[in-house]
């Protein structure tokens, strides 16, 4: 009897552990929605696929150095601005703070800097962020999030530039960098279904004959077609505010709820030059030559003026 109880307790413990691990992986899977559905986050049109779920258009900004030398670590700063006072609708229908996330698409050869190459000052700017590659084979595409927007509306990516001496496919050129950044939850899930962070429209026209408030939040709205009496039931999840009432006549696709979304997605780009050190040295040598030539010219002119003055006095 004791043995069977011990086995039962062990099985229950294992099941609980599996549940916790599964729930954790699901909650952490949000940043990789795009990774699961798209081989490349940037479409041929230039659109970043995050816009398929985050429908509202919002600004995003990226700041990188104008030029970098090979095999050096630099900062790519992504800013995702929004009103910190705003609250979004959470999955349970309650209100909470906004999260942010970003995808950074670097040129081939550029990648996340290893921890031992990141300076203490840069680590302090990064905070406790954990970046990941979009794919194991796409080390030049980085993703982060969701992370609290109150703390990380400015995200510092530590980037290592490539060295053409060791990577033959890399050249000393000007390269584009693309970024996408979102604040708040999306309106559509990757499977195409709506989240509770969007507006819900009527699936039919007619009389709102009944509205039932569900125990866990949300509504069931029954719409009776005036022509044939056919009834359609629209399910509204908890979160959006209801705009219609019983006895009201509505049209097809008329909004049944408000739009609770306060976030959105934006994308931008920047350019960076992978600079050849020999070119820099050549430029410095040229500038030094010009300066020396100017100095010698001034000295020669003064010497000539002294000679002229001496001849005049003579």
Curated annotation (Swiss-Prot):
GO cellular component: chloroplast thylakoid membrane
Entry binding sites for heme: 30, 50, 53-54
Manner of cofactor binding, per the entry note: Binds 1 heme group covalently.
GO MF annotation list: electron transfer activity; heme binding; iron ion binding
Pfam families tied to this protein: Apocytochr_F_C (PF01333), Apocytochr_F_N (PF16639)
Assembly and interaction partners: The 4 large subunits of the cytochrome b6-f complex are cytochrome b6, subunit IV (17 kDa polypeptide, petD), cytochrome f and the Rieske protein, while the 4 small subunits are PetG, PetL, PetM and PetN. The complex functions as a dimer.
Taxonomic source organism: Illicium oligandrum (Star anise)
Annotated family: Belongs to the cytochrome f family.
Main location, first listed in the record: plastid
Keyword Signal (UniProt): yes
Gene name for this UniProt entry: petA
Membrane topology label: Single-pass membrane protein
Listed cofactors: heme
Entry's localization field: Plastid, Chloroplast thylakoid membrane
Record InterPro entries: Cyt-f_TM (IPR024058), Cyt_f (IPR002325), Cyt_f_lg_dom (IPR024094), Cyt_f_lg_dom_sf (IPR036826), Rudment_hybrid_motif (IPR011054)
GO biological process, one term: photosynthesis
Disulfide bonding pattern of the chain: none
Name under which the protein is recorded: Cytochrome f
HAMAP family reported in the protein's UniProt record: Cytb6_f_cytF
Presence of keyword Thylakoid: yes
This protein's UniProt keywords: Chloroplast, Electron transport, Heme, Iron, Membrane, Metal-binding, Photosynthesis, Plastid, Signal, Thylakoid, Transmembrane, Transmembrane helix, Transport
Transmembrane annotation, as ranges: 280-300
Signal peptide: 1-29
Role of this protein: Component of the cytochrome b6-f complex, which mediates electron transfer between photosystem II (PSII) and photosystem I (PSI), cyclic electron flow around PSI, and state transitions.
């Amino acid at each position: 009897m004791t043995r069977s109880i011990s086995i039962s307790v062990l099985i229950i413990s294992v099941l609980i552990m599996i549940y916790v691990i599964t729930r954790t992986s699901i909650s952490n899977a949000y940043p990789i929605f795009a990774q699961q559905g798209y081989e490349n986050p940037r479409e041929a049109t230039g659109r970043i696929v995050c816009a398929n779920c985050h429908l509202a258009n919002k600004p995003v900004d990226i700041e990188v150095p104008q030029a970098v030398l090979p095999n050096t670590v630099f900062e790519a700063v992504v800013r995702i601005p929004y009103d910190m006072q705003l609250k979004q609708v959470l999955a349970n229908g309650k209100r909470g703070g906004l999260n942010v996330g970003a995808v950074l698409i670097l040129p081939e050869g550029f990648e996340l800097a290893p921890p031992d190459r990141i300076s203490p000052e840069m680590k302090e700017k990064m905070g406790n962020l954990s970046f990941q590659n979009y794919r194991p084979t796409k080390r030049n595409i980085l993703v982060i999030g969701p992370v609290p927007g109150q703390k990380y509306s400015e995200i510092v990516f530590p980037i290592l530039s490539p060295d053409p001496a060791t990577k033959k496919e890399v050249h000393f050129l000007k390269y584009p960098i693309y970024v996408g950044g979102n604040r708040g939850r999306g309106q559509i899930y990757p499977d195409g279904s709506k989240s509770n962070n969007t507006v819900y429209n009527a699936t039919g026209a007619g009389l709102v004959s009944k509205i039932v408030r569900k125990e866990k939040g949300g509504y069931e709205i029954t719409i009776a077609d005036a022509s044939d009496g056919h009834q359609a039931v629209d399910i509204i999840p908890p979160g959006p505010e209801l705009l219609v009432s019983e006895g009201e006549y509505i049209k097809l696709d008329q909004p049944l709820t408000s739009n609770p979304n306060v976030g959105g997605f934006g994308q931008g780009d920047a350019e960076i030059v992978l600079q050849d050190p020999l070119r820099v040295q050549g430029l410095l040598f040229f500038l030094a030559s010009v300066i020396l030539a100017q100095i010698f010219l001034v000295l020669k002119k003064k010497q000539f003026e002294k000679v002229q003055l001496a001849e005049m006095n003579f």
